[in-house]
Amino acid sequence: MDDFRKQIDSIDQNIIENLSRRTEIVLKIGEIKKQDKNAVYHPAREIEIFNRIEEINKNSKFPSPVLIQIYREIISACRALEKRLCIGYFGPQATHTHQAAIHQFGSSCDFIAFRTVADVFKEVELGKVNYGVVPVENSTEGAVNHTLDMFITSSLHIYAEQYMPIHQYLLSVCPDLSSIKRIYSHPQALAQCRLWIENNLPHAELSETSSTSEAVKVCLWDKYSSAVAGRIASELHPEIKILAENIEDNPSNNTRFLVIARKDCAIRSANDKTSLLFAVKDQAGALSRVLNIFSQNNINLNKIESRPSRKKAWEYLFYVDVDGHRSDPHLREVFQAVEKETVFMKILGSYPKARITVEEIS
């Protein structure tokens, strides 16, 4: 056994030495970025690294999701040596958006919670934070209209995206499930766990709070209460215990989050997406003509969502996600054709498609 432990010690030393060498190279790249005035955060490059690491590790016994988490923190720590980023997110603290922000950027950043989606947009626009993280749609409840509406007037761009499964946990300072008398949470979270609560705590009193984070704060002083919240809440409050995991009624429920920035993500990846807003003329077949342009040019539409324009009654804007990067010559021609058929068109950004790997974040 001692011999095996010595081998492990030697391997650990090699890992640390290689991490140190990797860091030195990252800092050299950082100097080049600074000279060229390039951003330190490149989501396309990070996705490329994660995909390569996963491929290298495919025949290993070490779990790839854990390896990706480790590399996310390595990248975050190295990025912070170039420049420590400040990330604004739709709060409060310990919510799913907070968790999404950490998952996107790693923990070597400063995170600031804002009360509303509009506040996140405002602080990014003013340059008080480098990037913002906001929810844009949920697989069971549809679009987050507040976020879509902000893009109508905002000058910000979509820089990256992320999908995160929404898992709910029952948290409490009381270690005994049978002693729980009250359950606190946001009404949406309570609704997502209705069947589990009915089957496991049918006599518990349900109390609504302004957020899952607020629910956790309440149950810190209410001994025989519990909170429905995400795992991150238990990590931020060590005195809180997890009584039950994954208590949501729909295990496939997930939310899409956007990273917003003052500049577009100019660097292309091998698998990009472009988002745009447009309004069509008030005449029969106007929307159909626009959609036919995409169809005839073999451009796949990932999403289409309508929103009131707020300028004129019964006038609508359409939010669309399509495959490809805005710099693609073919897609540029398609957008030019679309613009001729619309009264308003705005490209919100081109960015790499998110890695859909639920195991990393569940």
Segments the model singles out, each with a brief description of its role:
Residues 1-362:
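Domain-level signature for soluble enzymes in the chorismate/prephenate branch of the shikimate pathway
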